[in-house]
Amino acid sequence: MQLYRDDGIVLRTQKLGEADRIITILGRTSGRIRAVAKGVRRTKSRFGARLEPFTHVDLMLHTGRSLDIITQAEVIRPYGQPLPGDYPRYTAGVAMLETAERFTPVEKEPALRQLLLLIGGLRALGDAEHAPGLVLDAFLLRSLAVAGYAPALQECARCGAPESGVTGSGRRLPAFAVAAGGMVCASCRPPGAASPAAPTVALMLALLSGDWDMADRSERRHRVECSGLVAAYLQWHLEHSIRSLRHVERV
């Protein structure tokens, strides 16, 4: 068996046999890894609580036939430590972990940008400088962008017409169409497209670009509308819902 080292975030764990667990990790160099931690469920396990979700760990592993084996684990930063006592932040963090796993469907395919986004998002949740819903939506939008699915917010997703003010009949990009890829002009607007408020679109752009001054000043109604659009857009492109999003408490 080949020995290798990596660091990453623990995404989830599941029981294996009477004393072991399968640990899913998003690694810096290895991408998403599924590895066995032997004896981790025993009271006197040498791993202790080092392999819990949200934890940034430094690992030594042996390659196995189907699952690798964790031989050593050291905590770099326990991002989950401040979260259980804060339900909105905890549920936002769980949604981040699930999303990161969905965006890395192929095992051992490098996904450094996704890992760095996840680390940044978990750090922001722990620091509590911004509302957890904003941190989550920023993470979701940027994850979509890394995967090549950034929504068009400043030009029509279909014809490319720019959002450069208003026409005689209103905004040039009055609608958001999930299947089209973002904002659309009146000519390209499909049936059933949403009509978000202008501040909602501005908030989405701020979260995507990292303009936290603008995002923090946003009103709750625009945050709620933004979250709904982001969730719908995410589900469309993943072709699968993020189950934990339904438990996120928006504030």
Predicted regions and their residues:
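Non-catalytic alpha-helical scaffolds and adjoining flexible linkers that form interface surfaces
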Residues: 1-251
